[in-house]
């Protein structure tokens, strides 16, 4: 029984000890963006533009960890990006407008519906 308690305690301590390393690896900042596509733009039409923005710009930025996107009904769109830091997320936004893929991406979005929030772990 004492061996079991020792092993259990060791496992718990190891789990807590690696949590900060896992958080850094997975990104400490979660960026959530929502928007609506312009009238007449389908999810099938927009999806390749969304993938191009990720591939050609976002994924190449310092501090990028991961990105996923999904569409809802009526042109709703959701993008979740994980960054290592707020500084990395802000730096990416500062260069986004200049990215070649961004122009086509933004041309299909209704600007007044765009919302971005950042959360920290």
Language-model region placement:
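Positively charged n-region of N-terminal signal peptides that target proteins for export
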Residues: 1-5
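Intrinsically disordered, low-complexity segments enriched in polar/charged residues with Gly/Pro
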Residues: 24, 43-44, 54-57, 67-68
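Short alpha-helical
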Residues: 41, 74, 87
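Phosphate-binding glycine-rich loops and adjacent basic patches that engage nucleotide phosphates
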Residues: 12-17, 50-56
